[in-house]
């Protein structure tokens, strides 16, 4: 049976992931990980490598087939890399979403998550075009 891990870091993310979680819980082994407490501890530390390290250990132990992440928070690239190096398939929800109100960091972080992801779920046609443009701009991914 397939094992999938949903990772979120705040209540709003959980609300958006909940329909996906409920769908997959019907047919798969599903784990939901709330990293919000870990993130709060690290905000003063600023060492985001600890998130990578923690996820790498957990993913190695649990042997997930997929991880599912949402959005563009600054800790997500570290989670993505842990899964990527363990050959766990990555599902990026809200891929390609760009907003004028987002900080410049968000505009860089989202593609950093989408590129190693195996699946990008876009919420709009504009987002889908952004993801397609991103992949066309990288010669070895064409």
Kindly label every feature range from the protein language model.
Residues 68-86:
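An aromatic- and histidine-rich active-site surface loop
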Residues 28, 86-88:
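Helix C-cap/helix->beta junction micro-motif
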Residues 88-142:
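Active-site-proximal region of nucleotide-activated glycan assembly enzymes
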Residues 2-61:
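Glycosyltransferase specificity loop/lid
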Residues 14-18, 73-79, 128:
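Short glycine/serine/threonine-rich phosphate/pyrophosphate-binding segments
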Residues 7, 69-70, 93:
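Structural motif
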